[in-house]
């Protein structure tokens, strides 16, 4: 158990201090700290903590989300669309899991759940009759403005 805590702390420190542009870079930084971790383990950990890739001066870098605000979400959500049974949200690569978690927490009373890939989220409402209202609420929550 102590090893997992040490690995978690090392990973958090890497992302909070300098970030990393690839999972391989995270593996290399861990290795320099004496921690051997495979790319697939790093990938699972990044999903677990809802790490996202944020564009910056040095290119996109993995980072840990801190809070929801207009600047952190607005550039990550590209569209919110829906049909008669499903809402589909397109996001920046690597941010769908974190955004889906925000939606799950905020809309737990009106949705059955979310399914997130790398850059796409499927949202299933409890009642199909309310889908347009839920889609608009999600859109407003995520600060996405339709054309």
Swiss-Prot record:
Q: Describe the family membership recorded for this protein in Swiss-Prot or TrEMBL.
A: Belongs to the ArgR family.
Source superkingdom: Bacteria
Gene name linked to the record? argR
Q: Which PANTHER family match?
A: ARGININE REPRESSOR
To which pathway does this protein belong?
Amino-acid biosynthesis; L-arginine biosynthesis [regulation]
Q: Does the keyword Nucleotide-binding apply?
A: no
Which keywords describe this protein according to UniProt? Amino-acid biosynthesis, Arginine biosynthesis, Cytoplasm, DNA-binding, Repressor, Transcription, Transcription regulation
Native organism: Chlamydia felis (strain Fe/C-56) (Chlamydophila felis)
User: Where is the protein situated, by its record's location annotation?
Assistant: Cytoplasm
Organism lineage: Bacteria, Pseudomonadati, Chlamydiota, Chlamydiia, Chlamydiales
Query: Would you tell me the protein name for this molecule?
Result: Arginine repressor
Say what the protein does.
Regulates arginine biosynthesis genes.
Q: Name one GO molecular function term.
A: DNA binding
- GO cellular component, as recorded: cytoplasm
> Might you name a Gene Ontology BP term for this protein?
regulation of arginine biosynthetic process
Where's it mainly located?
A: cytoplasm
């Amino acid at each position: 158990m102590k090893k997992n805590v040490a690995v978690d702390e090392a990973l958090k420190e890497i992302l909070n201090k300098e970030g990393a542009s690839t999972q391989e870079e995270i593996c290399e930084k861990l290795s320099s700290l004496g921690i051997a971790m495979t790319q697939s383990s790093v990938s699972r950990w990044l999903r677990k903590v809802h790490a996202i890739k944020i564009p910056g001066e040095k290119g996109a870098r993995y980072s840990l989300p801190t809070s929801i605000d207009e600047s952190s979400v607005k550039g990550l959500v590209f569209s919110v669309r829906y049909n008669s049974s499903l809402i589909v949200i397109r996001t920046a690569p690597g941010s769908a899991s974190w955004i889906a978690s925000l939606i799950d927490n905020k809309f737990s009373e009106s949705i059955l759940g979310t399914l997130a890939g790398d850059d796409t989220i499927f949202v299933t409402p409890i009642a199909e009759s309310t889908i347009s209202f839920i889609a608009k609420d999600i859109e407003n929550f995520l600060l996405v403005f339709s054309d």
